[in-house]
């Protein structure tokens, strides 16, 4: 008998045992064509109180069997296949969890500017042997905000009738949206676009001078506090029609302040149904 199969000195259930930070390159056969992703994977199974340890090599074998030998059509399909393979190889496990961190590219347009922009993504799936399935999708993006308070104060002080013509300070904002659902995974593209539309303006990798001017002018017509950004993002995510109402939503923003030595943070947690209820009452 393997040492792992012996009874443990302290018979306690372990929710997760496995590897963190397994790096693999995966090829997805998407409807838009082949996509190569560099993945950082966490692969776990649970462990019954009657067993001392997990046969950990099976975790890597499960990853290799899927990444090397199969072609998934999506990142969610890839992770689901790995989780199923984990349950198949670990007959004693009741639950498998797989998390992937990677960088995605989203087609973006704002103020007449177009670009294919990077977003950071973390996708987690948990499968149970009884058929339970849980997804968590987190997307992190960057954008800019224009301070409405400074803009309003300067407009009033300088007698500027149109506040959007008044100067203000602007800052880069780091925005992260996370949705936790049952058997429906939120599409990365949908979540990313909801977030990217929640700033005074998004950021772009390449801007020529006329594009830069248009983007800044548009941002100044939409001044936002970091609190506004978080609420706007939650509103837009809740408007994605296929997300079930029971889904858990979390939005976090960090504003890298330009005129202060410290940063600002805002965060919201809610069920999607609660946000939708407020949205319907405000129409």
UniProtKB/Swiss-Prot annotation:
One of its GO terms (molecular function) is GTP cyclohydrolase I activity. Converts GTP to 7,8-dihydro-D-neopterin 2',3'-cyclic phosphate, the first intermediate in the biosynthesis of coenzyme methanopterin. The keyword Metal-binding applies. Its EC number is 3.5.4.39. Belongs to the GTP cyclohydrolase IV family. The gene is mptA. It holds the Pfam family GCHY-1. GO terms for biological process: tetrahydromethanopterin biosynthetic process. This is GTP cyclohydrolase MptA. Homodimer. It comes from the Archaea. Keywords: Hydrolase, Iron, Metal-binding. Its cofactor is Fe(2+). InterPro entries: GTP_cyclohydrolase_FolE2/MptA, GTP_cyclohydrolase_MptA. It catalyses: GTP + H2O = 7,8-dihydroneopterin 2',3'-cyclic phosphate + formate + diphosphate + H(+). The record marks 147 as: May be catalytically important. Binds 1 Fe(2+) ion per subunit.
